[in-house]
């Protein structure tokens, strides 16, 4: 995936929002490019979690569209979006090996398996876990 576009996204947990304060997420129109490092910052209750849930497919926005590399994925289910979130405190999947934990984000991005293997082995060397 090369780009995520938020095309005039808004969300309300009210069935028929009529006032400005009914919107959990005010209109967002933004683009993220592949390879960038981004932080989503703001005070409690400003809509950060709502936005992440919309991008990942856990919520469908009340208004607007989400595009992954130009493709409208607004109505796609979470499993069909091929996206994962990396949180401030990353999770290690205890049902996966160290190798598979390192390979997981690369595979989610559709990196060819030969390149996944190369990058994972390089990373294991860097952190002195190649023998494990």
Predicted regions and their residues:
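Short coil-to-helix segment of the ABC ATPase nucleotide-binding domain corresponding to the Q-loop/switch region
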Residues: 96-104
